Amino acid sequence: MEIFPAIDLKEGKAVRLSKGDMRSAKIYSHAPQELAKIFEGYGARWLHVVDLDGAFAGETVNFDAVEKIIKSTNLKVQIGGGIRDEARIKRYLDIGASRVILGSVALNEPNFVREMAKIYPVVVGIDAKEGFVATQGWAEVSQMRASELAAKFATAGVKAIICTDIAKDGMLGGVNLDFTLEIARASGVDTIASGGVKDMSDIMRLKDSGEVAGVIVGKAYYEGKIDLKEAFRKVL
């Protein structure tokens, strides 16, 4: 199982939100690329980077900060937030991103995502409130169940699905294993758990399930609840 340290970008700074509320943003670093170097030193292989401003605006906002992060280490980077057309996919891959996350567009234009997955390394991001897909930086909730959307990409060739339980995100209340397994089983695609990881026991529960391909760790690290060096030793 892979562990993805998370860097969420708002106005070029690394922040964490609670339940996706931009007003709750807490700044953890004014130089996100330095965080990337720290994670690399701990033994990370991947980074999970989100342009929060981009997710809400529907367009790329923190491109320069993302480029600095990518150029500062040898880590593989998956990037999401406001990527809704082929030009933006190519732009991120051209600066060295390893794969791109398509979120809102997966609900609104699933055929576009399938086409892109044939050409580029694409990850689908599915964010859910009470089991239903949320889009536009989590500001809107649809009538489609997350598992139903996941099933649409079972044979699309996407590299992974990231599933986030919004109610858990940034709350340090424990990961939603049942939801993660529901997505993994509905899609048959490598599934990455996101939202609510509180400590090492959560990571081990996901690993021990044998059905989860990865986990994203954000606030639990920034608030000192998880020793990432130890986590990488135990899991990778």
UniProtKB/Swiss-Prot annotation:
<keyword id="KW-0413">Isomerase</keyword>
<dbReference type="InterPro" id="IPR011060">
    <property type="entry name" value="RibuloseP-bd_barrel"/>
</dbReference>
<dbReference type="GO" id="GO:0003949">
    <property type="term" value="F:1-(5-phosphoribosyl)-5-[(5-phosphoribosylamino)methylideneamino]imidazole-4-carboxamide isomerase activity"/>
</dbReference>
<comment type="similarity">
    <text>Belongs to the HisA/HisF family.</text>
</comment>
<keyword id="KW-0028">Amino-acid biosynthesis</keyword>
<comment type="pathway">
    <text>Amino-acid biosynthesis; L-histidine biosynthesis; L-histidine from 5-phospho-alpha-D-ribose 1-diphosphate: step 4/9.</text>
</comment>
<feature type="active site" description="Proton acceptor">
    <location>
        <position position="8"/>
    </location>
</feature>
<dbReference type="InterPro" id="IPR023016">
    <property type="entry name" value="Isoase_HisA-like_bact"/>
</dbReference>
<keyword id="KW-0963">Cytoplasm</keyword>
<keyword id="KW-0368">Histidine biosynthesis</keyword>
<dbReference type="InterPro" id="IPR044524">
    <property type="entry name" value="Isoase_HisA-like"/>
</dbReference>
<dbReference type="InterPro" id="IPR006062">
    <property type="entry name" value="His_biosynth"/>
</dbReference>
<feature type="active site" description="Proton donor">
    <location>
        <position position="127"/>
    </location>
</feature>
<protein>
    <recommendedName>
        <fullName>1-(5-phosphoribosyl)-5-[(5-phosphoribosylamino)methylideneamino] imidazole-4-carboxamide isomerase</fullName>
        <ecNumber>5.3.1.16</ecNumber>
    </recommendedName>
</protein>
<dbReference type="GO" id="GO:0000105">
    <property type="term" value="P:L-histidine biosynthetic process"/>
</dbReference>
<dbReference type="InterPro" id="IPR013785">
    <property type="entry name" value="Aldolase_TIM"/>
</dbReference>
<dbReference type="GO" id="GO:0005737">
    <property type="term" value="C:cytoplasm"/>
</dbReference>
<dbReference type="InterPro" id="IPR006063">
    <property type="entry name" value="HisA_bact_arch"/>
</dbReference>
<dbReference type="GO" id="GO:0000162">
    <property type="term" value="P:L-tryptophan biosynthetic process"/>
</dbReference>
<dbReference type="Pfam" id="PF00977">
    <property type="entry name" value="His_biosynth"/>
</dbReference>
